[in-house]
A protein has these predicted regions:
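C-terminal helical subdomain
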Residues: 177, 193-240, 244, 248, ...
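N-terminal Rossmann NAD(P)H-binding glycine-rich loop of SDR-like oxidoreductase domains
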Residues: 10, 18-19
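Rossmann-fold cofactor-recognition segment
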Residues: 45-60
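Ankyrin-repeat alpha-helix packing hotspot
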Residues: 105-106
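Conserved hydrophobic beta-strands of the Rossmann-like cofactor-binding core
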Residues: 3-6, 78-79
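Catalytic loop of short-chain dehydrogenase/reductase
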Residues: 83-84, 88-89, 98, 120-172, ...
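Conserved Rossmann-fold cofactor-binding substructure of NAD(P)-dependent oxidoreductases
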Residues: 56-74
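Conserved glycine-rich Rossmann-like NAD(P)H-binding loop of the short-chain dehydrogenase/reductase
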Residues: 24-40
Length: 260
């Protein structure tokens, strides 16, 4: 059985994936943004391998999340599920970053770099990433007029590019991105066409399945099928330059080569 860490797993797709994996006998480590959210997981607290707490908007707390997970032990897989949707204003994290960038892009990058390397990485993206622009010179929206829909789309482009970059940087790790579809969650709303079980299937499958179809890397998935992502996400120069920029923004360096 595998041990899986899932960010943003107190509700929505993250919680659904956790329940699905627990029901299959796997060990799951949950993540809650606050102690209040963690305390609400009373029905799962005795079943999981751990619950880590920290707000991904904060770089300091993201470092602490990585420390908490590493203290539990190496994960077999990590599902980077946490994300926020459109915000009407740029906002400002404790480090001065745009909220969407911090949670959707910087946090998964930092956790990937700071946590002990797993065998599998799964990054939740969105079909909306195709409407994102690279804009590596202004990732943090300090120069452009704020556009919440564009900021979200860009953040989801970033994680696809990150997944593909890691497939090259760490060839022994299976690194993939997933579009779960517009699912009926607190974020997606009650009118969304995809039920929550279907929405969590692909990322859960990629995290643990030994089927040959799941033992691949550098792919973009939608409902158990590989799809073609935005051309920019597949551009090697864009991937490389994006990672350089993320390292500059966070002060965190992504390790290279084989697992230490």
């Amino acid at each position: 059985m595998a041990r899986i860490f899932i960010t943003g797993s107190t509700d929505g797709l993250g919680l659904a994936a956790a329940r699905s994996l627990l029901n299959k006998g796997h060990e799951v480590v949950l993540h809650a943004r606050s102690t209040e959210r963690a305390s609400a997981l009373t029905d799962l607290s005795s079943q999981v391998a751990g619950v880590v707490v920290g707000d991904l908007r904060s770089a300091t707390e993201t470092h602490r999340i990585a420390e908490q997970v590493n203290a539990i032990g190496r994960m077999d897989a990590v599902i980077h599920n946490a994300g926020i949707y459109t915000q009407q204003s740029r906002g400002s994290t404790p480090e001065g970053h745009a909220g969407i960038l911090a949670v959707n892009t910087l946090a998964p990058f930092m956790l990937t770099a700071l946590m002990e390397r797993p065998d599998r990485l799964v990054y939740l993206s969105s079909g909306l990433h195709r409407s994102g622009e690279g804009s590596l010179g202004d990732l943090d929206w300090t120069e452009r007029p704020w556009n919440p829909a564009r900021a979200y789309a860009e953040s989801k482009l970033h994680v696809v590019a990150l997944a593909f970059f890691l497939a090259r940087r760490w060839p022994q790790v299976l690194s993939n991105a997933v579009d779960p579809g517009w699912a009926r969650t607190r974020m997606g709303g009650a009118s969304a066409p995809v039920d929550i079980h279907t929405g969590q299937l692909t990322q859960s499958w990629l995290a643990v399945s030994t089927e040959p179809a799941a033992m691949v890397t550098g792919r973009y998935w939608h409902h158990l099928r590989p799809e073609l992502p935005a051309a920019e996400a597949m551009d090697l120069a864009f991937q490389d330059n994006m990672v350089i920029r993320l390292q500059e923004l966070t002060g965190v360096v992504l390790p290279g080569g084989r697992r230490c």
